[in-house]
């Protein structure tokens, strides 16, 4: 089944390019860890999901590109064409001459209704080229104007027109120090609207990705492309083909559906975080060796301690014993608290994958009391390695990972709202203060719901 990707705004289009490039490079790199037949099946499965064939034989991304300024879209189309490996389709992009000026209301209330027909027609055309549609993957920022405001509008229209198709939004959480003065307003408006219209929110924090670039990739001058390539690697490690539940010879057909079924058991809980190991520079990788036991030990501790990467994991945090608070709970540092999960998916790729022991992720102490571990944990596998790593593991977690950053962003936005700061920038484009209050109420309920999962 195929996935149609919608790239929105500067952030969405730049990340979208890196995602398709990473998917294509991985599926076409030489692999010595599986048979030629298995490798060809892997390539075919990737192609069905993310690409379609054009008459000239060059794979074309199943994507629609949207921005309110032409510069980034033109650059993105050009880079894909110049790669010589794959391309975007003709007539799959929409852009205008005027951006949204980091104003969520302008993207949502002005650009959205004005360009709805053109954008939705492009998406419909792409959908009609799929033999079978798994759903939509919408890549956007959370804090700007076009990606966030228009992105929320487009997601709502996708829900209206394709209510039976799955919608996953991949969202970039802004730097905590702030790129835009109104980013907290934009963020709460984006999240609250997506919570009503999307099936799942796959969230990446800029601060965390930046640390991976600096600490794990050893990059000195970190660019947006560096950040986007780390994001693309993490997304590829989740969405590239894996074996179906009942066979080690056939790849699963419906990755979005399978992922949602495992990870989003209740509409109150839609926030997913991704962790991936190992991630390191090519120079470091040349001198590194990995065991499944070591990788999974680190990944499990990253989960329960809310660590963003392998470096700096707090090994003091332990799951709670029955009837007792978790070790680490009494810490003065709130980030050291035990992270309770609703559901987890581990994706394993590489040599000897069937020998990997994931029993540590089935511990009932990791999960909220109202779900059995058999329902809360899933593992996907393939012996085909991903990218340049002989062994790699990814974790997609529906847990309390994002409660603290969400609570902080709601608090900052409320402080601004209570003093009526910058509200006029939104009300002049048709928004009312009641819209803000609705957003606050919804997100405060999300924080409370995740907080109720466990200790």
Swiss-Prot record:
GO terms for molecular function: GTP binding; structural constituent of cytoskeleton. Keywords: Cell projection, Cilium biogenesis/degradation, Cytoplasm, Cytoskeleton, Developmental protein, GTP-binding, Microtubule, Nucleotide-binding, Nucleus. GO terms for biological process: cell projection organization; microtubule-based process; positive regulation of smoothened signaling pathway. PROSITE patterns: TUBULIN. CDD domains: delta_zeta_tubulin-like. InterPro entries: Delta_tubulin, Tub_FtsZ_C, Tubulin, Tubulin/FtsZ_GTPase_sf, Tubulin_C, Tubulin_CS, Tubulin_FtsZ_GTPase. Highly expressed in testis. GTP binds at residues 143-149. Pfam families: Tubulin. It is found in: Cell projection, Cilium; Cytoplasm, Cytoskeleton, Microtubule organizing center, Centrosome, Centriole; Cytoplasm; Nucleus. Disulfide bonds: none annotated. One of its GO terms (cellular component) is nucleus. Acts as a positive regulator of hedgehog signaling and regulates ciliary function. Found in a complex with TEDC1, TEDC2, TUBE1 and TUBD1. Belongs to the tubulin family. This is Tubulin delta chain. It comes from Mus musculus.
